[in-house]
Regions:
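C-terminal segment of classical bacterial N-terminal signal peptides
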Residues: 14-24
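Gly/Pro-enriched, hydrophobic low-complexity segments
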Residues: 148-238
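Flexible, processing/modification-adjacent segments and terminal tails
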Residues: 91-167, 177, 188-192
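N-terminal leader/targeting segments and the immediate start of mature chains
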Residues: 22-56
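Solvent-exposed N-terminal domain segments of exported/luminal and surface proteins
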Residues: 46-103
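Short, surface-exposed loop/turn motifs at beta-strand boundaries within globular domains
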Residues: 32, 46-54, 68, 139, ...
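Bacterial N-terminal signal peptides that target proteins for export
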Residues: 1-13
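Polar/charged side chains located within well-ordered beta-strands of beta-rich proteins
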Residues: 43, 57-59, 211, 230
C-alpha cells in the first residue's frame, strides 16, 4: 500500500513538473512574446482610432433558422471607451394567431429569447474587442500558442482560458497590416453546458482602421443565431 501511494505521489509530482515546464517554455518563447506584444499594441492603437468613428450595426436574430427580429443601431464610442447604441428601427415576425393563453405563452417565450439574445451578444462583445491585459495574462500563464498551417503572411494564435475557464479563442493576425483578420471563439454563458460559438470577420477602412465587419453568434442550447453586420463608418463631428 505504501509503495502504491509513493508511486501515485511521484506521478502527481511529475505531472505538476511537466505542466510547470510547459508553462515556463511558453512564457519564454521569444517568437510568442513578440507576436503577443504586436497584437496588444495594434489592438490598443486601433481601439483608440476607432473611437473617432460612428457607424451603423444591424442585428438579425433567428431561432431554429427562422428570422424572428431585425434591429438597426447607430453606434458610437463613449468617453469610457464603451460602445453606445441608439436604436434606429426594428422589425419582428408577426405574432401567431390564437387565444389569450397561447398569446401569453408566445409573449413569455419571446421575452425569454430576447433576454437570452442580449446575453450572448454581450458575451460576444467581450471577445470581439481583445483586451491587451487578458492577452498578456494568457501568455504569462502559458495559455497562448502559435498554430501552424495558416495563410502566408498571417499568424494564427490559439488562446485558452482567455475570459472564462475552458474557453478558447483562435485569432488570425496579419503580419503585413498588423491587424486582426478573424476570430473563432468557443465559450459559454454561466454554465459550460450553455455553449456559445462566435465567428468574427474584420475589415479595414480606407484610413487603415480595423473593425468588426461581421459576427455570427450561436447560442447552442436555444438554437439561436445572432448575425451582426457593421457598416457606414463615418468620422464623428467632434
Amino acid at each position: 500500500m505504501k509503495t502504491r501511494l509513493t508511486f501515485l505521489a511521484s506521478l502527481v509530482a511529475i505531472s505538476v513538473g511537466v505542466a510547470f515546464a510547459l508553462s515556463e517554455a511558453a512564457a519564454q518563447n521569444p517568437q510568442m512574446e513578440q507576436k503577443v506584444a504586436e497584437i496588444k499594441q495594434a489592438s490598443a492603437a486601433n481601439k483608440q482610432a476607432l473611437a473617432r468613428y460612428t457607424w451603423q450595426e444591424q442585428q438579425v436574430i433567428s431561432v431554429k433558422g427562422e428570422v424572428k427580429k431585425t434591429v438597426s443601431y447607430q453606434v458610437s464610442v463613449g468617453p469610457d471607451g464603451q460602445q453606445q447604441k441608439i436604436e434606429l428601427g426594428s422589425s419582428a415576425a408577426p405574432p401567431p394567431s390564437g387565444g389569450r393563453i397561447k398569446q401569453h405563452i408566445v409573449a413569455k417565450k419571446r421575452d425569454e429569447f430576447q433576454e437570452y439574445g442580449q446575453q450572448v451578444a454581450a458575451l460576444a462583445k467581450q471577445y470581439t474587442q481583445p483586451d491587451p491585459q487578458l492577452l498578456q495574462q494568457a501568455y504569462q500563464q502559458g495559455n497562448a500558442s502559435l498554430q501552424l498551417g495558416g495563410a502566408p503572411g498571417t499568424v494564427t494564435l490559439l488562446i485558452k482560458n482567455y475570459l472564462k475557464p475552458g474557453d478558447s479563442m483562435t485569432m488570425v493576425f496579419s503580419e503585413g497590416t498588423k491587424t486582426i483578420q478573424s476570430l473563432q471563439i468557443a465559450s459559454y454563458l454561466n454554465d459550460p453546458n450553455d455553449a456559445v460559438t462566435i465567428a468574427v470577420q474584420f475589415a479595414m477602412l480606407s484610413a487603415g482602421v480595423n473593425h468588426v465587419a461581421t459576427a455570427q453568434i450561436n447560442g447552442v442550447s436555444k438554437q439561436m443565431t445572432v448575425a451582426i453586420q457593421n457598416f457606414n463608418y463615418q468620422l464623428s463631428q467632434m
